[in-house]
Amino acid sequence: MPTSGRALGALPLAILFMTLLVPLPGCANHARVVSLAGVGADITPPPRVELCGTLSLPSHWPDGTPVNGLSDLVWERDAGLLHMVSDRGWLHRARPRFEDGQLVGLSPIDSHRLRDGDGLPLEGSAADAESLSLLHGTNGKLGDSEFWVSFERDHRLQRFDRDGGPLAAPIRPAQAADAAPNKGMEAMTELPKHGLILGLESPPPGAAPGETRLFTLDGKQWRYPLAAPTGSALTELTADGDDLLALERAFAPPAPLVISLRRVRLGEPPELDVETLASFSSADGWWLDNMEGLTRLDDGRLLLLSDDNASPLQRSLLVCLRPR
């Protein structure tokens, strides 16, 4: 993910200008309905998706819990809840609200710190959680959800309970060992055929330019070609039947900020097919941010989540897309 300093120093001027025209995200402690289209922009979504609502999330919940640095989210069907993880080591539960098919609100339920084996909150680089995968979310039982959480900087994967307590020792996959500190296991989901699928944010050493790595814990690897926009990086995966949906962010100022949604069909390793479903570019007037999270709801709608890097010039956005 872009670090806070890079984000502050390199935001495209158009996005910076639009930011000054609306209330800052920290001005309230409730989610606000906003437009993903920039001020005065006369634009429509790409033809294969439609927008079904956008929220700007607060920097703190009403009880004072920080809500910045959000990295990923997962939908729990059993409870009808979203679980969100931050790169500051927080695990949040919240309930989205829809009216006439549009996302109009998000109500916080509770928040917990991710903890180590001694019960102490994770801090600093140890807390840099980037992706979240849910266990036991569709078995009809309430209260038994668990999570896989991937971390970068200290590249590892670990299982946690719903309150942030560790359930097993960390796993350090060899396929992520050569990743740059801030370019590790940014993407993760589970497929019935393969189990956990993880993706590195950017090309690891020795990879072809513009090509990063998807892998499983039992040793399968695929070569994933990133989208064409300059600076494209893989930020999340979610399951859609037997396929994957991939979220990419292209952040390379002064080039436009571009967010791409892509479909991935895994073949025999290392082969796969990738199809771009939709791209949103700041050059067209979309008021984008650092999109890092992706989850699929039961009816096929998608929720995208952005990481504000704890910057007053960025926003934590929750965006609803409906594939056509």
Functional labels for PLM-detected ranges:
Residues 2-5, 9, 17-324:
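Sequence/structural signature of beta-propeller domains
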